[in-house]
């Protein structure tokens, strides 16, 4: 919100802390994949879809109606979410139902939503 970032007034390296963190740092490819995950989550339409699926398993037609977009546009977004393993689907007759892929996605979304809601309360 425009506040300045505080900086150290003198340079002093805390080698013990640096080594502890360095030893526990994930591999570079894992960090790249994590950044990609957050990129996928960085789209408002995909966040709406995740919110919808956070609440209820749903078919493409219903998601499109809720979001106010075409089924083909929603299908494209669902494809992106599926490639990132954020959503999964199941078929029931001619209808395809989407849901969040696993509990991790639910937790990520729930924590993010709570974080934003707390910011609005300040």
Language-model features and meaning:
Residues 99-122:
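Conserved segment of winged-helix/HTH DNA-binding domains
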Residues 24-72, 96-103:
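N-terminal helix-turn-helix DNA-binding core of bacterial DNA-binding proteins
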């Amino acid at each position: 919100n425009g506040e300045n970032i505080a900086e150290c007034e003198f340079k002093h390296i805390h080698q013990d802390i640096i080594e502890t963190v360095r030893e526990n740092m994930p591999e570079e490819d894992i960090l790249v994949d994590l950044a990609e995950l957050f990129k996928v989550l960085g789209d408002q339409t995909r966040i709406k879809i995740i919110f919808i699926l956070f609440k209820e398993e749903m078919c493409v037609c219903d998601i499109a109606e809720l979001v106010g977009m075409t089924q083909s546009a929603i299908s494209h977004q669902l494809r992106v979410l599926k490639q990132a393993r954020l959503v999964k689907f199941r078929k029931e007759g001619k209808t395809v139902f989407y849901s969040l892929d696993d509990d991790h996605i639910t937790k990520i979304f729930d924590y993010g939503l709570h974080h934003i809601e707390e910011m609005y309360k300040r």
